[in-house]
Amino acid sequence: MKKILVHERFKEDWIQVLTHIANLFFENSKLYESIDNPDLSVHFQYKKENNVYSTACQLEVDGKTFDSTYSKEYDTDGTEREQNIRMKRALSHVLLDVLEQYTGIKQQWGILTGIRPTKLYHKFRKQGLSRDEIRAVLKKDFRVSDEKISLLESIVERQLATIPDLDEIGKEVSIYIGVPFCPTKCAYCTFPAYAIAPNRKTGRVATFLDALHIEMREIGKWLKENDMKVTSIYWGGGTPTSIEAEEMDALYQTMYESFPNPENIREITVEAGRPDTITPEKLAVLKKWGIDRISVNPQSYTDETLKAIGRHHTVQETIDKFWLARNSGMDNINMDLIIGLPNEGIEEFQHSLDETEKLMPESLTVHTLSFKRASEMTRNKEKYKVADRATVARMMEMAQAWTRENGYYPYYLYRQKNILGNLENVGYSKLGEESIYNIVIMEEVQTIIGIGCGAASKFVHPETGKITQYYNPKEPYQYILAFEGAIEKKIEVLNALYALHLTK
């Protein structure tokens, strides 16, 4: 752990932001007001005069000093909260600069440590800034590289082409339905995912599905009564194809009966990520209900890697199930690859890209491994040897080159804390094959109603954009006990959120 002495007394939220900046350079760091023998020593100066925010930073390490200054003038006074954000950004700016000087590491995302950088781009776009003006702000005030700004520009262009009414889509809602079962739990996973076999034995799968039917009907009833339009539906989890074909059939029937005007829903996706759950019978059910967007996720095309991360299927099974789905009429298939999996380097990732090229799915999501706190991989980090920062960055470059050469375009992006190399996860697709749900959830432009185990509801105020969240219980037994209360709570929030909107 890097021990960093900060000679000023800062507010807790300032320390938190500066710690995020330090962690871009060091795997783990902690800022102290007082400590003996620090690894780094940092002096800050800052002031606000009228609407001008000025900061300076000096880093002392190993007898060397590194200096940086920054100043920005704003047109308006801003609220107290906005003033606080402005100063945190100004302090982040100079700390990032001195750490880049010291380490020689250039942070491509600059001071942006949040999950959704495209959301910031859309904010500037809605404020009326031109493309050139947005580029200048991102470069000067956020220190984002030209390469990443170009990536954001490409993504926003695809999003607006896919959803021309993106700025008005807050009048509609999308729905996420969580089925929390998987054949096994992967080592990197923190989603609500429970091995299906033991839950089947205890009867918990059947009881959960009974509750899920009820929740779908009750939420659907509210949507119909309030004449709400549904943009998209996403079945996730877990792996929703872990259950039997007959159980899937019954759920989709309830979906079509419960939600308003299903023929007008723009997109329905079913996450079939684990190839070992895909069967001809289940594919037939999907086709019966007009669902042709699914995910078949290899993650890697190296059997040893799959074994190491707890995915109990083979590479060949992934390939076979892809073609089974394709020959069953599935014409919009997504596949996922993960950069930085244990014991994988340039050679293994190139092999994964070569194998993907033989399949050519409609979309490809390239994830960078993130050490999430609750995952098996994080709890036992010493067991899993992963690539260094330079290798991970090279693999991301390989993915970008491969997608360009094969006619895929980036259309959504998100980042995570503790992600290898401070990189990003990017969704690519062939033109016209973009996922509507992925765009609306990443850009937080409309309410997502979460149904099922561990499902997160994200309520976006249709006029102010203010976001509130509600989480269903993660564990199946707790969900079974509490789902009725969860339904009541969500309907209560929906009534309050849309009361004014629905009476207009």
Regions found by a protein language model. Give the residues of each.
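A C-terminal junction/extension of Radical SAM enzymes
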Residues: L31-L40, A374-I451
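Conserved non-cysteine loop/helix-boundary elements of the Radical SAM core domain that shape
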Residues: A193-M398
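N-terminal [4Fe-4S]-dependent radical SAM core
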Residues: Y102-K106, K126-Y176, N226-D227
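Radical SAM enzyme core and accessory elements
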Residues: M1-R131, P164, G427, L431-K504
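Beta-strand scaffold of nucleotide-dependent catalytic cores
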Residues: G178, S295, L364-T368, I439, ...
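Short, glycine-/Ser/Thr-/acidic-enriched flexible segments
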Residues: P240, N418, G454-S457
